[in-house]
Amino acid sequence: CMPVMVPTMDFSVEGVVHPFVKDAQPNSWQMSRGNICIFTGSNMAGKSTTLKALTLAVWLAHCGLPVPVKSMICPLYEGIYTSINLPDSLRDGRSHFMAEVLRIKEVMQKAVTGKRCLVVLDEMFRRTNAKDAFEASVAVNELLKGFSHCHFLISTHILEYAKAFEKDSSCCFYYMEAEII
C-alpha cells in the first residue's frame, strides 16, 4: 500500500512483513507512547526481522514507493540509522563491542542536531556479558529519552532492561510471541 506520511510523530503499521521472508507472519505495531519502543521476546521470535521490516517499510515510504503493509502512518524523518549486525575489524583493532559503541555514539551525534530521525538498535551490547550489557543499555536508554524528536526501536533479550523502563512514559513495548510446533 501507499503509506500516509505525516509531519507529526504518529507512527503505526498494520500487517508489516519483510518482503524477503517466505510465508512471513504479518505484524501490526504502533508507537503507542513516548519515543522509545523496546521489542522483547525469545530467540527466533522475530524481533530482528520485524525491526528490519519496519526499517525497510520506512525507507520505501520515504522513497515514495509502495510498502509491504496493509496500512501505514509514518513520520517524515530526516534520517534513518541502524545498528544491526555490525562487523568487527581486525585491521582497525575494533571489536564487535567497540563497533557498536562507536555506532551508538554516531547516532547520538545525529540526534543532537535536532533532526527527526528513526534509529533502530538490534540487541544493544549483545557481545558483552549480561551485567555490562544491562548497565550500558539502561544508560543509553536514559540518554535517548531526551531526544523526543526521534524514534528509537530497540530489541533486547535482557528482560531486566525492559523492566527497568516498564513504567516510563517515554517507552512503549512490543512483545514478540513464539510458538514451538
PLM features per residue range, with description:
Residues 3-181:
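ATPase nucleotide-binding head domains, primarily ABC-like/P-loop NTPase cores
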